From Swiss-Prot:
Pfam families the record matches: RHD3_GTPase (PF05879), Sey1_3HB (PF20428)
SUPFAM superfamilies on file: P-loop containing nucleoside triphosphate hydrolases (SSF52540)
Name the record gives this protein: Protein SEY1
Source organism of the structure: Meyerozyma guilliermondii (strain ATCC 6260 / CBS 566 / DSM 6381 / JCM 1539 / NBRC 10279 / NRRL Y-324)
Name of the gene: SEY1
Residues given in the record as GTP binding sites: G74, S75, Q76, S77, T78, G79, K80, S81
Length: 850
């Protein structure tokens, strides 16, 4: 192939090849004729520069699929080249009539710029771009019995052309060799092997066999000649050996047959020209009922792909390999579509990186407009596919569509990375927004938590799906995993918040119940009675009804309005009940502790011992009265002890809680708040070590109703006895001091001896006023029944002053002997011995420091 001269349409020099007819390119009149290029040399070498010829003859981008390939086939020296030159205004070499020999060697092709018609020359450009191939004639003496090239050339023409002109003389009709029937049979057999299986797939492609009958005299009509040829062809087709699966295929499934007659060129030149013009009409006039170009004749390959397709076909034919023409067309389409795909995808990547690098989620600080981003992605994808469609839709449709899907997938892969980044970013951002919005302070107060969160979740999911729809081009990109991840995260956040709210509801309700229970117990223990614990239990249940059951109890159970499951609600109810009973038990233990119980008993004792039924302080006049009241007060105080230490109802039964609040397993299971995932019940073996009987405190109460243990009760009794006994002794001492009084006659003596002083007081206005005030105060105290308490207070003050005076006198008396001894020592000149002081000399040599 290297010795083939390159096409040069701009030069008028003749390039001579020793193996060609005269030259590979023929100089012509450029106003009407076109140069011809040798496609396959007589040495079976394919010219790989055909595309350059096509591009120079007419731009390939303008031709696109708007072209037709016409080949001529027939015996040598039958005027094939002459016919093409006259009809298509080409300039193929023609035979020198003075020397009948082979003119066309190999296969040549030329672009037909003008077609001869009855309306005159019709330009090919802008209409039907026709490329004409002149095939070397058959049955030539130059090749003799070597029919290899003839067969290969016929196969090549059949494989690459839409219309195959079979040039035959009228007198050859009915002959076998003269009409090239033997060669046609070979062509049919190969055609069956090439296209047979594609016909099973409903392939509509056909080849038009246009028989041009030369030197038609008119004695035998064209219809009669056509019938003869058609019968011979069908008979020959039926005689072919076909595979079983192709036996049903008919001649008409592969070929269409048309006929045209030409009168003698020399003897009837005018009629010959007219017949050529009429044949030209059939190539150009779409309205002509005998128009030759049909859509299903075309190979559906753009002109730039056809040149590659033709080269591949010849390579397979020349190497005597099985020629699968559809496969060759597909290979060409694949190569070209891959080339186009690579080009448009590189352009796409460049634009994508330029436009959308700013949308990388790691660099995003401001809010992303996903609608704008999605629109930009969609426009870029659409532009890329349009560019591909414009260039690749000219090729085999199945390959074009397959490669289009490949391009779409490559674009999808690029977009998918961006979608995954934004999807993860949206999951993180919107879930954080959802978690923040779940705060009870931000939710509406007029609806339940479940309804509010459902609406909030719906809005967040709608926003997420809307953003996903924008950037996934209405769902064409995969975002299911992000939707799943997002919904799971929302469910997790919502589940955690539900338990937070549930814990809050339980805590608030229990706090109010605890406050009510503490208040009830505090009120009842001050004045305990047989029905004390009935009232405490009633207030305990009433507080539960008021703060819990009235709000959350329904006909089917409890509902907190949080959207929690029935099982969770049931466990919450169990927790509330257990913790409520635990709080009751805790308040009992707290308010009726050892110290508090001693105080309660002492207060009851003091109230009975020191005050009468009217609340007036008692002033005991004798020991008998004191002892009786002491015993009564003590019994009164101790009546409360069994009531307070054991929660017993008026019917004699003790309070039994619904749950054993002292059970450590239940304390772990029901005593704690819900965790964020919903508490999992503990198994008995999980707390086995915590329920070991050896670890139980002996001082602990044995049951729920016991406020304190028996040991603590004994301690309370002992302490109470000591304190009450101390009170009794104190009162007894005061009574004795009060009973030991001054004799009455002393007052008479004082009155007689101090009469003058009394009169002096009465005559003195100041003293008289003071006396009136004291008298008025005494009168008021008497009428208020406070005289005795006042006297007791005065007596105690006097006693206290007396004690202090005695103490001071004692201190003074103790100091007198010591002071007297010191004065005597001074008068005698006795001094205390003092230690003798001796001064030490400094023995350190002069000039030396310490």
């Amino acid at each position: 192939m290297s010795d083939l001269p390159p096409p040069d349409l701009g030069s008028e020099e003749i390039s001579v090849s020793p193996t060609s007819s005269s030259s590979s390119f023929v100089p012509i009149d450029k106003n009407q004729l076109q140069d011809a290029v040798q496609v396959v040399s007589e040495a079976k070498e394919f010219n790989s520069l055909i595309l350059d010829y096509v591009r120079k003859a007419t731009p390939a981008s303008e031709v696109n699929n708007n072209y037709h390939i016409v080949s001529v086939f027939g015996s040598q020296s039958t005027g094939k080249s002459t016919l093409l030159n006259r009809l298509f205004n080409t300039n193929f070499d023609v035979m020198d009539e003075s020397n009948r020999s082979q003119t066309t060697k190999g296969i040549w092709m030329a672009y037909s710029s003008i077609i001869t018609t009855s309306q005159g020359p019709v330009p090919s450009k802008g209409g039907e771009n026709i490329f004409v191939m002149d095939v070397e004639g058959t049955d030539g003496r130059e090749r003799g019995e070597d029919q290899d090239f003839e067969r290969k050339a016929a196969l090549f023409a059949l494989s690459t052309s839409e219309v195959l002109i079979i040039n035959v003389w009228e007198h050859q009709i009915g002959l076998y060799q003269g009409a090239n029937m033997g060669l046609l049979k070979t062509v049919f057999e190969v055609n069956l092997s090439l296209f047979g299986r594609t016909k099973l797939e409903m392939n509509e492609h056909k080849v038009l066999l246009l028989f041009v009958i030369r030197d038609h005299i008119g004695t035998t009509s064209k219809e009669s000649l056509a019938a003869t040829v058609t019968q011979d062809l069908i008979k020959m087709w039926d005689s072919l050996s076909k595979p079983q699966e192709l036996a049903h295929l008919q001649f008409s499934d592969f070929f269409d047959i048309q006929f045209h007659t030409l009168r003698h060129k020399i003897l009837q030149p005018g009629e010959f020209t007219t017949d050529v013009q009429l044949l030209g009409d059939r190539f150009t006039d779409h309205k002509n009922e005998d128009f030759l170009f049909k859509k299903y004749y075309h190979h559906d390959i753009p002109i730039d792909g056809w040149t590659m397709y033709a080269e591949n076909c010849w390579d397979q034919i020349d190497k005597n390999k099985d020629l699968d023409l559809p496969t060759q067309q597909i290979l060409v389409a694949k190569f070209k579509c891959d080339e186009i795909l690579t080009s448009v995808f590189e352009e796409f990547r460049s634009k994508f990186e330029e436009r959308h690098a700013k949308y990388a989620p790691t660099d995003i600080k401001e809010e992303v407009d996903y609608e704008e981003l999605g629109g930009s992605l969609g426009d870029l994808k659409e532009d890329t596919l349009e560019n591909y469609d414009m260039m690749a839709s000219r090729y085999n449709q199945s390959v074009y569509l397959q490669k289009r899907k490949t391009l779409e997938q490559k674009i999808t892969d690029v977009y998918q990375d961006l979608v995954d980044q934004h999807g993860a970013h949206m999951v993180s951002k919107l879930s954080a927004k959802f978690a923040s919005s779940l705060s009870s302070k931000k939710l509406p107060k007029d609806v339940s938590f479940a309804l509010a969160t459902e609406a909030l979740r719906k809005d967040i999911v709608h926003q997420f799906l809307k953003n996903c729809s924008c950037i996934t081009l209405n769902g064409s990109l995969d975002h299911a995993k992000h939707v799943t991840s997002f919904t799971r995260k929302l469910d997790s956040i919502l589940s955690k918040q539900r338990f937070v709210e549930l814990n809050s509801i339980l805590a608030k309700s229990l706090k109010k119940v605890e406050s009510a229970v503490a208040k009830a117990i505090t009120q009842e223990i001050s004045e305990p009675s047989e029905s004390t614990w009935d009232r405490v239990l009633e207030k305990f249940k009433g507080a539960q009804d008021e703060y819990f059951y009235s709000k959350y109890e329904t006909a089917t159970g409890v509902d907190f309005g949080l959207g929690t499951s029935a099982s969770v609600n049931e466990r919450a109810l169990e927790k509330f009940q257990f913790r409520a009973w635990s709080l009751l038990h805790l308040q009992m233990r707290k308010l009726i502790s050892k110290d508090n119980l001693v105080i309660i008993l002492k207060d009851r004792f003091e109230d009975k011992f020191r005050y009468d039924e009217n609340g007036i302080p008692r002033l005991y006049q004798n020991s008998h009265e004191l002892e009786l009241n002491f015993t009564a007060a003590k019994e009164h105080a101790l009546k409360a002890l069994p009531i307070l230490t054991l929660a017993t109802l008026s019917d004699g039964t003790t309070i039994v809680p619904k749950y054993d609040v002292r059970d450590k397993r239940l304390q772990k299971k029901l005593g704690a708040a819900f965790d964020t995932t919903g508490e999992v019940d503990l198994k008995d073996e999980d707390v086995e070590s915590d329920t070991d009987e050896e670890d139980e405190d002996e001082n602990e109460p044995k049951c729920f109703a016991e406020a304190i243990s028996e040991t603590d009760k004994a301690s309370v009794l002992s302490k109470f006895k000591k304190e009450t006994d101390a009170t009794f002794v104190e009162s007894k001492r005061a009574l004795i001091q009060h009973v030991t009084h001054i004799p009455y006659y002393i007052y008479i003596v004082i009155l007689v001896l101090g009469w003058n002083e009394f009169m002096a007081v009465l005559r003195n206005p100041f003293f008289f006023t003071l006396l009136l005030m004291l008298g008025a105060g005494t009168y008021v105290l008497y009428h208020l029944n406070l005289l005795k308490p006042a006297m007791v207070v005065v007596q105690r003050m006097f006693d206290e002053c007396l004690v202090i005076a005695k103490q001071k006198l004692k201190e003074f008396i103790d100091e007198q002997p010591q002071e007297h001894a010191k004065r005597l020592s001074k008068m005698a000149g006795i001094t205390e011995d003092k230690p003798e002081e001796i001064e030490m000399s400094d023995l350190t040599p002069p000039g030396e420091g310490s």
